Amino acid sequence: MATPVGTALTAEPESTAQRARRARIIQATLALASRGGYEAVQMREVAERSEVALGTLYRYFPSKVHLLVSAMAHELERMRVRLQRKAIPGDTRQERVSYVLERSTHSLQRDPNLTEALVRAMMAADATVADEVTGVRNQMADLIIQAMREGEAPTEEDEAYAGILQDVWFARQIAWLGGRISSEAIWDDIEQAIALVLRD
């Protein structure tokens, strides 16, 4: 279901040097976003920090939104790798999905500036970034499916449920960043959604 990072998000680098360059760009982006949020990520500074020409940066990522959405994909991929290191705790799919989404939420809340930059980019994305945004949403849905199915192939119903829950998860992050709900309320809402959608 998910689009592998580096394919739909941008053209897959073909050489070791290109892969290293792309990694430096993403790391520079994450550092700037963590320091000052969305506004702190300026393409020229990203190019300088990652030691690439500005034109090269734009060939990889046509805009700041493309860049930050790709950085979001990178963070979700890191999360997926961490979750695969051991069995996800929980005797039911509700418990396992709750664990995954709680970990995901807490991971974002530890760095509000970075979260603001990544989620704001998702909100600002227009039709030119549609494939990238879809890829990120699919990654989040796949994390949920991973918890639901424990390695088994998902059903169409599983994919529909995961889509609903990732929509709720993203919506609650947006509300939190906008100051409309507290961090505690985020989790209350997500837990309620899990209970309603996944009735074991």
Residue locations for each model-derived region?
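Amphipathic alpha-helical packing segments from all-alpha helical-bundle domains
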Residues: 77-80, 126-152, 156-167, 184-196
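Short secondary-structure transition hinges
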Residues: 106-142, 153, 174-177
